[in-house]
Structure formats: structure tokens, C-alpha cells
Amino acid sequence: MAVGKESELAGLEGPHTKVLDLEGLTVVPGFIDAHIHVLSSGIRHITSVDCTADTIRAIVSRLQARACQETSDQWIQGFMFDDTKTEEQRSLTRADLDAVSLFQPVIVSHRAGHVYYVNSRALEIVGFSDRTPDPSGGLLGRDPTDGSLNGVIYERAVEPIRKHLPLVTPEVRQEGLRLIDSMLTKAGLTSVHDAMVSND
């Protein structure tokens, strides 16, 4: 393989050489991502609502649309929320997600993957109340005025909630892997390291 200007490559080609004229486009090596959550990202693209909207109202609207498609006890899941990309420049709250549903549990993950947002029904299912101490390795967000839970869940405090989420079927895992593989390939990634896998 040789890359360069046409004048620099003159005379290098043989009878079986394939010549590509990229017409001024840039050639780069395949990218390597040494820390990515391949499987879980693929699964979320299949099971969760994309929360990359400009306003919290728009995000709530997307979640409401999903809630209307699900049964009354089905978890409504969202992902890719980023407070810094919204007009409001704030976190989602329990009140925001209660507007999605008071009967269906709702959970949304932050784009960074270390903060989660839930509604009152989700807190009730897990057994979190205003008197619940912070779980080991995490924090329960609270209203600074009265100490009540505001629906923001930090780090490992989400683990008790995860135990209540629906199981992911092998079919969804496979579909998610196929989807994320195509997305990574389209972005130019040729090698990745999944930073968290399970025995499943």
C-alpha cells in the first residue's frame, strides 16, 4: 500500500494494483476505542428512548409517546440525556418524569453513564423513601429545602433499581450488537474494547 500525491506514486503500480482517487478526501487509519460499552450501548439503542432533545419538555414528550405504546406496568427507559445540551441547563427531576407516567416506572440515564433519573413509581417499586440512607457507593439526590428525594440517582445507588428492570433477551442482545457494530463501522472504528461485560 502507498499513499501520497499522484506524482509521488508514479511508477509504483503493477498489473494487479488497485488505484483509488479519493478526489481530495482525507485518509486516516482505523480508529481504536479503548473504553466503550459496546453491548450495553447497542441494547439501549434498541430498548430505550433517545433523550438527546433540546428541551426537557421535548424529552418528556418522547418518553410519553413510548409510555403510550407500553403496558401499564412496563418500565419506560431513556438514555443519552445531557443536561448541558438542553435549554434549561438542569437535570431531569422526579416531577419531570412523573409527567411521563404516575403508574409506569420511568428511568433515564445520563450520557456519561454515572447519573440516573427516575419517577415516583420507580422509587416506590424499589422501596426508596425520603428516609432511605444513601446506598453503598452511591447517592440519592434530595431537594435541598426539605430533604425529599428528587429522583436523581448517583453511581451505584442505581443497583437496586437495575434489579427490577426487565431482562434482556438473547434476541435483543444480538440485535443491539448488530446495530452498534454498524454504527461503529460507519464512524471509522475498527477496534474496540468493551469496558464492561457480563457472563450473559
Locations of regions flagged by a protein language model:
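Divalent metal-binding segments
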Residues: M1-D200
